[in-house]
Design a protein with these regions (language model features):
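Acidic, Mg2+-coordinating active-site environments of NTP-dependent enzymes
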Residues: 1-60, 74, 78-90
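C-terminal helical cap/extension that packs against the catalytic core
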Residues: 3-28, 113-115, 154-208
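Short glycine-/acidic-enriched loop or helix-start segments at secondary-structure transitions
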Residues: 14-16, 39, 125-126, 153-155, ...
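Short, acidic/turn-prone active-site loops that include or flank metal/cofactor-
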Residues: 32-34, 120, 145-149, 170-177
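Nucleotide phosphate-binding/pyrophosphate-handling subdomain across enzymes
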Residues: 53, 57-165
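Alpha-helix capping/helix-boundary segments
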Residues: 214-215
Length: 224
């Protein structure tokens, strides 16, 4: 199976090459000659403008995805299919509405609302806030943060407080933490994994979890 990437950093390209060599997959690193601009974001998805700089073609499209990262990934798919496989953009319009890409801003359930986003940097957390505020008010929601690097915890916690979340918890997983979280979180804001599980299952209001790709299978498949 061929692998396509727009990796510009040498360290990323080298890592991909090694992995593809191990799996015997051909790797194609392409120049990013496309742009994606979000025109409108609603609870049902995003209307965006896709521009192929290589062909000059541009088209307004809709995706049920709410995270800008996933919309850019859809732009990558469009560019590859249109440029490398000569599939007309118009033929892909309807199919785009069906594309679901797991891993970013996943709505696990709507009633009660459960959202998971493995954002772990201030920039990605900012994107999470933009998406989340479209479907729910932070003031009505509980936010759970876990597995963030120490230097980023205070920044993201501050951003979460400014966003006005009803309650913000740090989920304490000792096996993966680097230091005692009580050094930067009040003890009553720290939850054990067991108490987090109870909160996730029993809380009737809206709840969002952010912090790490490592726990994606646990959250999205409810394995906790």
């Amino acid at each position: 199976m061929p692998v396509f990437s727009f990796a510009q950093k040498k360290i990323v390209a080298d890592m991909l090459k090694k992995k593809c060599d191990d799996l015997h997959c051909p790797l194609f690193i392409e120049k990013r000659d496309f742009a994606v601009d979000v025109l409108e974001k609603t609870p049902s998805g995003q209307r965006f403008l896709y521009v192929n700089h290589k062909t000059g073609e541009r088209m307004e499209l809709f995706t049920p995805e709410l995270n800008i990262v996933q919309t850019r990934n859809i732009g990558l798919v469009l560019f590859i299919l249109e440029t490398l496989f000569s599939i007309p953009l118009e033929k892909m319009r309807k199919e785009i509405k069906k594309i679901y890409i797991p891993g970013r801003f996943e709505i696990i359930s709507k009633k009660p609302l459960r959202v998971f986003d493995p954002c772990h940097t201030p920039e990605s957390f900012k994107n999470f806030l933009k998406s989340f505020s479209v479907i729910e008010k932070p003031s009505k929601s509980v936010l759970c943060i876990f597995l963030l690097k120490d230097k980023k915890i205070k920044t993201i916690f501050s951003m979460a407080k400014d966003a006005g979340f009803k309650k913000i918890y740090w989920i304490d997983l000792p096996v993966l933490r680097k230091k005692d979280p009580s050094s930067f979180f009040c003890k009553d804001l720290i939850l054990s994994s067991e108490n987090f599980s109870k909160l996730w299952k029993n809380y009737k209001g809206s709840l969002a979890c952010v912090g790490s790709f490592y726990l994606a299978p646990l959250i999205t498949l409810k394995r906790f």
